[in-house]
Amino acid sequence: MGLSTLEQKLTELISAPVEALGYELVGIEFVRGRTSTLRIYIDSEDGINVDDCADVSHQVSAVMDVEDPITVAYNLEVSSPGLDRPMFTAEHYARFTGEEVSLVLRMAVQNRRKWQGIIKSVEGEMITVAVEGNDEVFALSNIQKANLVPHF
């Protein structure tokens, strides 16, 4: 998935303190708006609880205060990926091959920006998704947002 330059810089700054605490940095989202939000997704083999999120928030806040990469006021949110886990990297798609995914594309493919189907494969920077009986291939750089579809 194509990250903005700011998101790339933030990922570089945030990954070290998150990993030093023993967590996996799943990904980040920076949402601009009236009140901008920096959302950090973390995970671990044992799962994530509120204390884990607080620890990461404290460490990341310290780094952000020193480095100051965001020039506007923002809220910091730290959470687990949840059931509708967002996906950010080719490794995420490969890990969840066979699972259902919902995609929002940056640029339409076949006049559609929203797609949902089963992840079939990942090759380099391309993902193949089975959609309504057809295999559709998407460039990761064209995926604006991707989430697993939970089944209950």
UniProtKB/Swiss-Prot annotation:
Predominant location: cytoplasm
CDD domains named in the record: YlxS_C
Top-level taxon in the UniProt lineage: Bacteria
Subcellular location: Cytoplasm
Alphabetically ordered keywords of this record: Cytoplasm, Ribosome biogenesis
InterPro entries: Ribosome_maturation_RimP, RimP_C, RimP_C_sf, RimP_N, RimP_N_sf
DNA repair in keyword set: no
Pfam families: DUF150_C, RimP_N
Keyword field contains ATP-binding: no
Protein's job: Required for maturation of 30S ribosomal subunits.
Similarity comment text for this entry: Belongs to the RimP family.
Protein name in the entry: Ribosome maturation factor RimP
